[in-house]
Amino acid sequence: MGRKWNNIKEKKASKDANTSRIYAKFGREIYVAAKQGEPDPESNQALKVVLERAKTYSVPKNIIERAIEKAKGGAEENFDELRYEGFGPNGSMIIVDALTNNVNRTAPEVRAAFGKNGGNMGVSGSVAYMFDATAVIGVEGKTADEALELLMEADVDVRDILEEDDSVIVYAEPDQFHAVQEAFKNAGVEEFTVAELTMLAQNEVELPEDAKAQFEKLIDVLEDLEDVQQVYHNVDLGE
């Protein structure tokens, strides 16, 4: 758990700033979550998670509202949730989550991204067993001890609490995402620096510089694909 979540978020946001691609990806994810359940986050937990994540990336309100209104309006555009697994340079492990309205387009694009950048796509289950689904919540203005105390008082179980720069990062089971946030909100916390549901590698590996450069290019190419929502990996990039 050595990665710095605020650094990762800032790097991702800056890379996507010119194209607003990150907003488009959130728009798609919000639409799908709202369409699959109620368009009200209070009665749709999946939508609530996406909206909390969107807040930490400062996704504009109009994009959020447009996606929810599109779902309310009964739009017929349907998306499939897909997960691809594969290997990067030096046997590094990668999971790719996608939302697509054309499966026949997405799979070849992901496979090509792997193949052209020193990797190869694996079969389902080939790397996922080395990752744990995890809720990651970050707050400022609290110490790890203070966070632990308020979470214990709220009877919320977490895996770990780490201090990172000016933030405290809480790792918990995915189904504790809202419980962790509510515990902090009840303690006066109004904003979260990190709010993610992620696949966390059980063990991170370091790559030599040449393989690391190729790996970073592979991740960039995968993240730039229109249908790809999230890319998870087990490489320590020094973030």
Swiss-Prot record:
Single GO molecular function: DNA binding
Location within or outside the cell: Cytoplasm
Presence of keyword Transport: no
A GO BP entry: regulation of DNA-templated transcription
Record keywords, A-Z: Cytoplasm, DNA-binding, Transcription, Transcription regulation
SUPFAM superfamilies recorded: YebC-like (SSF75625)
InterPro entries given in the database record: Integrase-like_N, TACO1_YebC-like_2nd/3rd_dom, TACO1_YebC_N, Transcrip_reg_TACO1-like, Transcrip_reg_TACO1-like_dom3, Transcrip_reg_TACO1_YeeN, YebC-like
Annotated GO CC locations: cytosol
Primary location recorded for the protein, binned into one broad class: cytoplasm
Family: Belongs to the TACO1 family. YeeN subfamily.
Name under which the protein is recorded: Probable transcriptional regulatory protein RBAM_007230
